[in-house]
């Protein structure tokens, strides 16, 4: 998994608002995985606007033309306790950092407090390069440290790329199909130190 010094890892896990790591995509592109910030609003909005309709449908299970201001605020305004959100960013030639992926979990404080719902979104030109895989790995470490035992996600049955991310995660997985939705549960109990 991640190769962090024990001291640095404890500090990052104690306060995920400061989470930061450097990674490399499958194609060699350097990326930063870090906690979402309020100033990511425009970059996230631009990434969403560039998505094709099918990508939006696979993520939200409904057509959606754009994000409203309240929806954008909800995306960037996280508490890093019940809701943890990380972004993957790259630096453009001019030095501007742009968001190319978003991964988040929302803990279920009521019904199953040890579980969290998981979701990802990857910018169009960066799909298939391992961004969701990296975000999942980092989110799993944070969630495990926070005492969560499992992630849950509902995935459209034809969304093979997302299902493959879960299958290749190295985490114990169970699946249950209901119509065209596959309910995935990933156990965080093993393989995470």
Regions from the language model: what does each represent?
Residues 1-193:
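Long, contiguous binding/interaction regions
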């Amino acid at each position: 998994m991640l190769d962090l010094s024990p001291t640095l890892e404890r500090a990052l896990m104690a306060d995920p608002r400061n989470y930061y790591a450097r990674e490399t995509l499958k194609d060699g592109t350097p990326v930063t995985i870090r906690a979402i910030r309020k100033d990511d609003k425009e970059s996230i909005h631009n990434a969403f606007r560039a998505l094709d309709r099918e990508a939006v449908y696979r993520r939200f299970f409904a057509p959606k033309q754009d994000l409203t201001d309240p929806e954008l605020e909800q995306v960037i305004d996280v508490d890093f306790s019940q809701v943890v959100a990380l972004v993957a960013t790259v630096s453009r030639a001019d030095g501007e950092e742009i968001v190319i992926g978003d991964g988040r979990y929302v803990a279920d404080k009521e019904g199953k407090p040890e579980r969290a719902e998981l979701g990802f979104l990857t910018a169009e030109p960066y799909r298939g390069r391992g961004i969701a895989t990296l975000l999942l790995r980092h989110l799993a470490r944070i969630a495990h440290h926070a005492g969560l035992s499992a992630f849950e996600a509902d995935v459209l049955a034809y969304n093979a790329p997302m299902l493959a991310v879960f299958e290749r995660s190295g985490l114990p997985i169970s699946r249950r199909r209901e119509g065209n939705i596959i309910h995935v549960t990933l156990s965080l109990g093993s393989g995470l130190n």
